[in-house]
């Protein structure tokens, strides 16, 4: 069996509107016939915890998929540089107050390629429960998958 050297991590919470974007993307990816070296994880709201426990010496590339608010049109997909993450509130701390940006930067500095695929959300409903993505964000799921498949081939 081929070692897993690419880790795709979907972050977010399906109960809070567009925050579930990363979960929706990895749900679709899990049903696809991906190369043997790719591992897909739905980290939910515990992205930092999963990343800290799942990254081992075999991992060469991490692709994080998440809904992020960076003041663009809802549904806009943006590939985010690791250096931009501390400027995004969600990446300063995750739902468990674990700083994710410094951890991703540290992985990057250790030679692991870190790619963050963000989607501009329209409705982040926390603390109010509202399952389901907005129409704009739902339409962006396939575009994100297309970008991720391109990243896998690099």
UniProtKB/Swiss-Prot annotation:
It is an enzyme of class 3 (hydrolase). It holds the Pfam family HycI. CDD domains: H2MP_F420-Reduc. InterPro entries: Pept_A31_F420-red_hyd_d (IPR004411), Pept_HybD-like_dom_sf (IPR023430), Peptidase_A31 (IPR000671). Its EC number is 3.4.23.-. GO terms for molecular function: aspartic-type endopeptidase activity; endopeptidase activity; enzyme activator activity. Keywords: Aspartyl protease, Hydrolase, Protease. The keyword GTP-binding does not apply. The keyword Transferase does not apply. GO terms for biological process: protein modification process; protein processing. SUPFAM superfamilies: HybD-like (SSF53163). Belongs to the peptidase A31 family. This is Putative hydrogenase maturation protease MJ0253.
């Amino acid at each position: 069996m081929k070692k897993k050297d690419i880790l795709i991590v979907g972050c977010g919470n399906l109960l809070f509107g567009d925050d579930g974007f990363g979960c929706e993307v990895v749900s679709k990816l899990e049903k696809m016939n991906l190369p043997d070296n790719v591992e897909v994880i739905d980290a939910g709201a515990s992205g930092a915890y999963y990343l800290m426990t799942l990254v081992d010496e075999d991992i060469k590339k991490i692709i994080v998929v998440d809904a992020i608010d960076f003041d663009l049109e809802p549904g806009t997909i943006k590939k985010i540089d690791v250096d931009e993450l501390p400027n995004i509130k969600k990446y300063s701390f995750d739902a468990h107050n674990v700083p994710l940006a410094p951890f991703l930067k540290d992985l990057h500095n250790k030679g692991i390629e870190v790619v963050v695929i963000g989607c501009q959300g329209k409705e982040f409903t926390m603390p109010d429960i509202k399952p389901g993505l907005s129409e704009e964000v739902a339409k962006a799921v396939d575009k994100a998958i297309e970008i991720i498949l391109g990243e896998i081939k690099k």
